[in-house]
Curated annotation (Swiss-Prot):
Positions annotated to bind tRNA: 18, 69, 71, 117
An example Gene Ontology CC term for this record: cytoplasm
An annotated GO BP: protein quality control for misfolded or incompletely synthesized proteins
UniProt keyword terms in alphabetical order: Cytoplasm, Hydrolase, RNA-binding, tRNA-binding
Site (Stabilizes the basic form of H active site to accept a proton): 96
Site feature location: Discriminates between blocked and unblocked aminoacyl-tRNA: 13
Location in the cell: Cytoplasm
Protein name: Peptidyl-tRNA hydrolase
Organism: Neisseria meningitidis serogroup C (strain 053442)
Length: 192
Protein backbone atom coordinates (compact mmCIF):
# COMPACT_ATOMS: atom_id res chain seq x y z
CA UNK A 1 0.00 0.00 0.00
CA UNK A 2 1.39 3.41 -0.89
CA UNK A 3 1.20 6.57 1.18
CA UNK A 4 -1.88 8.73 0.65
CA UNK A 5 0.13 11.86 1.44
CA UNK A 6 3.15 12.42 -0.82
CA UNK A 7 4.23 15.90 0.35
CA UNK A 8 4.30 17.53 3.78
CA UNK A 9 4.81 21.29 3.81
CA UNK A 10 5.64 23.37 6.86
CA UNK A 11 4.79 27.05 6.52
CA UNK A 12 7.01 29.75 7.94
CA UNK A 13 9.32 32.58 7.03
CA UNK A 14 12.98 32.08 6.13
CA UNK A 15 15.78 33.78 8.04
CA UNK A 16 17.24 33.79 11.54
CA UNK A 17 15.06 36.71 12.64
CA UNK A 18 11.91 34.62 12.11
CA UNK A 19 13.08 31.21 13.38
CA UNK A 20 11.45 31.46 16.80
CA UNK A 21 8.29 33.37 15.80
CA UNK A 22 4.77 31.96 16.06
CA UNK A 23 4.35 32.13 12.28
CA UNK A 24 7.09 29.48 11.98
CA UNK A 25 5.23 26.74 13.85
CA UNK A 26 4.95 24.83 10.56
CA UNK A 27 8.73 24.87 10.20
CA UNK A 28 9.10 23.64 13.80
CA UNK A 29 6.84 20.68 12.98
CA UNK A 30 8.70 19.86 9.76
CA UNK A 31 12.10 19.99 11.47
CA UNK A 32 10.88 17.44 14.03
CA UNK A 33 9.36 15.22 11.33
CA UNK A 34 12.59 15.31 9.28
CA UNK A 35 14.60 14.39 12.38
CA UNK A 36 12.22 11.50 13.14
CA UNK A 37 12.48 10.21 9.57
CA UNK A 38 16.25 10.87 9.35
CA UNK A 39 15.73 13.11 6.33
CA UNK A 40 18.04 16.05 5.62
CA UNK A 41 16.96 19.32 4.06
CA UNK A 42 18.89 20.93 1.25
CA UNK A 43 18.18 24.13 -0.58
CA UNK A 44 16.56 23.57 -3.97
CA UNK A 45 16.28 26.78 -5.98
CA UNK A 46 13.94 25.23 -8.58
CA UNK A 47 11.50 24.46 -5.75
CA UNK A 48 11.96 27.82 -4.00
CA UNK A 49 12.79 26.26 -0.64
CA UNK A 50 14.45 23.58 1.41
CA UNK A 51 13.50 20.04 0.40
CA UNK A 52 14.06 16.62 1.97
CA UNK A 53 13.08 13.19 0.67
CA UNK A 54 11.97 10.68 3.26
CA UNK A 55 12.32 7.14 1.92
CA UNK A 56 9.57 5.35 3.85
CA UNK A 57 8.49 1.69 3.54
CA UNK A 58 5.29 2.66 1.68
CA UNK A 59 6.95 5.17 -0.64
CA UNK A 60 8.76 8.47 -0.68
CA UNK A 61 7.33 11.52 1.04
CA UNK A 62 8.70 14.95 0.15
CA UNK A 63 9.19 17.53 2.90
CA UNK A 64 9.19 21.21 1.93
CA UNK A 65 10.00 24.42 3.79
CA UNK A 66 9.27 27.26 1.34
CA UNK A 67 11.92 30.01 1.29
CA UNK A 68 9.52 32.45 -0.36
CA UNK A 69 8.13 34.01 2.83
CA UNK A 70 4.71 33.01 4.09
CA UNK A 71 2.63 35.07 1.68
CA UNK A 72 4.16 33.36 -1.39
CA UNK A 73 4.25 29.76 -0.14
CA UNK A 74 2.15 28.53 -3.04
CA UNK A 75 4.97 29.14 -5.52
CA UNK A 76 7.20 26.55 -3.82
CA UNK A 77 4.41 24.02 -3.25
CA UNK A 78 3.17 24.22 -6.85
CA UNK A 79 6.72 23.84 -8.24
CA UNK A 80 7.43 20.66 -6.23
CA UNK A 81 3.94 19.24 -6.83
CA UNK A 82 4.14 19.77 -10.58
CA UNK A 83 7.65 18.30 -10.85
CA UNK A 84 6.78 15.11 -8.93
CA UNK A 85 3.16 14.93 -10.18
CA UNK A 86 1.70 15.25 -6.69
CA UNK A 87 -2.02 16.02 -6.59
CA UNK A 88 -3.38 18.66 -4.17
CA UNK A 89 -5.21 15.96 -2.16
CA UNK A 90 -1.82 14.26 -1.61
CA UNK A 91 -0.42 17.36 0.13
CA UNK A 92 -0.45 18.09 3.87
CA UNK A 93 0.23 21.71 4.84
CA UNK A 94 1.17 22.36 8.47
CA UNK A 95 0.72 25.93 9.69
CA UNK A 96 0.03 28.20 12.64
CA UNK A 97 -3.61 29.08 13.31
CA UNK A 98 -4.72 32.22 15.18
CA UNK A 99 -8.31 31.04 15.63
CA UNK A 100 -7.38 27.93 17.61
CA UNK A 101 -6.30 28.08 21.27
CA UNK A 102 -2.59 27.73 21.83
CA UNK A 103 -1.52 24.10 21.90
CA UNK A 104 -4.68 22.74 20.27
CA UNK A 105 -4.65 21.03 16.87
CA UNK A 106 -7.14 20.78 14.03
CA UNK A 107 -6.91 18.55 10.95
CA UNK A 108 -9.05 18.91 7.85
CA UNK A 109 -9.31 18.70 4.09
CA UNK A 110 -10.02 21.93 2.23
CA UNK A 111 -11.95 24.86 3.57
CA UNK A 112 -11.42 28.59 3.67
CA UNK A 113 -8.18 30.37 4.33
CA UNK A 114 -9.32 32.22 7.46
CA UNK A 115 -7.38 35.29 6.35
CA UNK A 116 -4.10 33.33 6.35
CA UNK A 117 -2.09 34.82 3.48
CA UNK A 118 0.02 31.70 3.02
CA UNK A 119 -3.13 29.61 2.51
CA UNK A 120 -4.55 32.20 0.10
CA UNK A 121 -1.44 31.91 -2.05
CA UNK A 122 -1.41 28.11 -1.93
CA UNK A 123 -5.02 27.97 -3.11
CA UNK A 124 -4.28 30.45 -5.90
CA UNK A 125 -1.23 28.51 -7.13
CA UNK A 126 -2.79 25.03 -6.83
CA UNK A 127 -6.12 26.19 -8.22
CA UNK A 128 -7.99 24.48 -5.37
CA UNK A 129 -8.37 24.45 -1.60
CA UNK A 130 -8.59 20.64 -1.59
CA UNK A 131 -5.38 19.82 0.25
CA UNK A 132 -4.99 18.60 3.83
CA UNK A 133 -4.20 21.01 6.64
CA UNK A 134 -2.75 20.42 10.06
CA UNK A 135 -3.44 23.60 12.00
CA UNK A 136 -1.37 24.31 15.11
CA UNK A 137 -3.13 26.72 17.47
CA UNK A 138 -1.18 29.81 18.51
CA UNK A 139 -4.05 31.89 20.02
CA UNK A 140 -5.26 35.28 18.89
CA UNK A 141 -3.95 38.54 20.38
CA UNK A 142 -7.56 39.73 20.77
CA UNK A 143 -7.39 42.65 18.35
CA UNK A 144 -6.99 42.19 14.61
CA UNK A 145 -4.73 45.26 14.48
CA UNK A 146 -2.21 43.38 16.63
CA UNK A 147 -2.10 40.21 14.50
CA UNK A 148 0.97 41.00 12.36
CA UNK A 149 3.14 41.89 15.34
CA UNK A 150 1.81 38.90 17.25
CA UNK A 151 2.58 36.23 14.65
CA UNK A 152 6.00 37.73 13.91
CA UNK A 153 7.08 37.65 17.56
CA UNK A 154 8.29 34.86 19.81
CA UNK A 155 5.66 33.15 21.94
CA UNK A 156 5.93 33.23 25.72
CA UNK A 157 7.73 30.31 27.34
CA UNK A 158 4.38 28.75 28.28
CA UNK A 159 2.92 29.17 24.78
CA UNK A 160 6.08 27.74 23.19
CA UNK A 161 5.78 24.69 25.45
CA UNK A 162 2.13 24.27 24.42
CA UNK A 163 3.00 24.57 20.72
CA UNK A 164 5.87 22.09 21.13
CA UNK A 165 3.46 19.68 22.84
CA UNK A 166 1.04 20.09 19.91
CA UNK A 167 3.86 19.35 17.47
CA UNK A 168 4.78 16.20 19.42
CA UNK A 169 1.14 15.04 19.46
CA UNK A 170 0.77 15.79 15.74
CA UNK A 171 3.80 13.65 14.94
CA UNK A 172 2.04 10.69 16.57
CA UNK A 173 -0.82 11.04 14.06
CA UNK A 174 1.39 11.09 10.97
CA UNK A 175 1.26 7.30 10.36
CA UNK A 176 -2.57 7.43 10.26
CA UNK A 177 -2.51 10.52 8.03
CA UNK A 178 -0.06 8.92 5.59
CA UNK A 179 -2.23 5.79 5.47
CA UNK A 180 -5.39 7.78 4.75
CA UNK A 181 -6.97 6.93 8.11
CA UNK A 182 -8.58 10.36 8.32
CA UNK A 183 -11.16 9.58 11.02
CA UNK A 184 -8.59 8.03 13.36
CA UNK A 185 -6.19 10.93 12.87
CA UNK A 186 -8.92 13.51 13.38
CA UNK A 187 -10.27 11.84 16.51
CA UNK A 188 -6.77 11.65 18.03
CA UNK A 189 -5.72 15.18 17.07
CA UNK A 190 -8.95 16.85 18.14
CA UNK A 191 -8.95 15.19 21.58
CA UNK A 192 -7.51 17.08 24.55
Amino acid sequence: MSNTIKMVVGLGNPGKEYEQTRHNAGFWFLDELAWKWKASFKEEKKFFGEVARAALPDGDVWLLKPATFMNRSGQAIAALAQFYKIKPEEILVVHDELDIPCGRIKFKLGGGNGGHNGLKDIQAKLGTADYYRLRLGIDHPGDRNLVVGYVLNKPSTEHRRQIDDAVAKSLQAIPDILAGKWEEATRFLHSK
